[in-house]
């Protein structure tokens, strides 16, 4: 009975996500009717139908909104997945993908390249620079946190916060001293957004989220044990430090990939796992797929709000998620 209910929940969430993805494509400064969106998708994917819509509508839907929607779904899924496993290995309900210092490293890399190097490889310049910065930040955090060959999760989180503050201070100083026209572009990226979405940029985040999901599902049993406490994990014959290190590495690499394209989008990794646990409990083989679907669903609709609330301007999506996340946790605390 429980397995049937879980399967029905996955089917319902999957169907809701699919419908949401299609419907969301109609929203924006230029509204496109849902029936036109549907016909454009059928024509571009399967070759069905004869194009009887405006060329501008096809350009907006297929080249701008579909990549943006897919990137939003991938980023939402990835951040929710990372948040769930970090909360498990740290046993901290407030653990978040950005606590590892990866986001600040990505920000610093982006600031340095945009202000002092320029677009040496076109549109890919900012994502590549951000990913390199994220990797360097991750390595610095791991080097500082590693003491006598041992990696403690509390020490790692503290090092992540410390490195994050230092790197953000350097990035803000460079922005203050740099060209203000270039700084404005970096500032919008720092606030989080999906404006960099292009078809050619989707393969890497898609691969990282899919591979991360497969690897973390394979670690569901150790994650369950760590949630129950380190003594339980040791009793079951697990090496808790090794499990934590693997999770931190996977989470850091995934965060680096996602943040390099979308900028800093907060609260998804904090909020979605709490909602998912209320639906299916804390068993990670059941929890992680639900987190992926809920994270995608959440960010797809937040992006709709971001591009319609102050149209024709784009509201930075990180601002929207922060506002929603703050209200969510106020409600959560009042309910306890």
Task: List each language-model region with its residue ranges.
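Alpha-helical transmembrane segments in inner-membrane proteins
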Residues: 1-336
């Amino acid at each position: 009975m429980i397995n049937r209910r879980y399967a029905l929940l996955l089917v319902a969430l999957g169907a809701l996500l699919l419908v949401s993805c299609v419907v969301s494509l109609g929203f924006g400064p230029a509204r496109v009717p849902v029936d036109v969106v549907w016909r454009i998708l059928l024509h571009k994917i399967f070759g069905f139908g004869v194009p009887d819509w405006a060329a501008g509508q096809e350009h907006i839907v297929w080249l701008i909104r579909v990549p943006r929607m897919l990137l939003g779904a991938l980023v939402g899924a990835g951040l929710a997945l990372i948040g769930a496993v970090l909360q498990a290995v740290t046993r901290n309900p407030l653990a978040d993908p950005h606590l590892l210092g990866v986001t600040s490293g990505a920000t610093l890399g982006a600031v340095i390249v945009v202000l002092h190097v320029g677009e040496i490889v076109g549109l890919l310049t900012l994502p590549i620079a951000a990913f390199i910065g994220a990797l360097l930040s991750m390595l610095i955090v791991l080097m500082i946190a590693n003491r006598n060959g041992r990696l403690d999760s509390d020490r790692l989180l503290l090092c992540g916060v410390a490195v994050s503050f230092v790197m953000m201070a350097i990035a803000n100083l460079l922005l203050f001293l740099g060209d203000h026209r270039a700084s404005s572009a970096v500032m919008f990226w720092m606030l989080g957004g999906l404006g960099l979405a292009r078809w050619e940029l989707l393969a890497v985040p898609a691969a990282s989220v899919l591979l991360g999901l497969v690897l973390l599902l394979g670690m569901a049993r150790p994650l369950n044990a760590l949630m129950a406490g380190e003594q339980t994990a040791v009793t079951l014959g697990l090496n808790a430090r090794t499990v934590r290190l693997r999770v931190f590495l996977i989470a850091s690499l995934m965060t680096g990939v996602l943040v390099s394209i979308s900028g800093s989008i907060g609260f998804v990794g904090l909020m979605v796992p709490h909602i998912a646990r209320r639906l299916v409990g804390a068993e990670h083989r059941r929890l992680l797929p639900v987190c992926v679907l809920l994270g995608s669903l959440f960010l797809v609709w937040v992006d709709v709000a971001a591009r319609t609330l102050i149209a024709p301007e784009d509201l930075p999506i990180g601002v929207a998620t922060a506002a929603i996340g703050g209200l969510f946790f106020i409600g959560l605390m009042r309910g306890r």
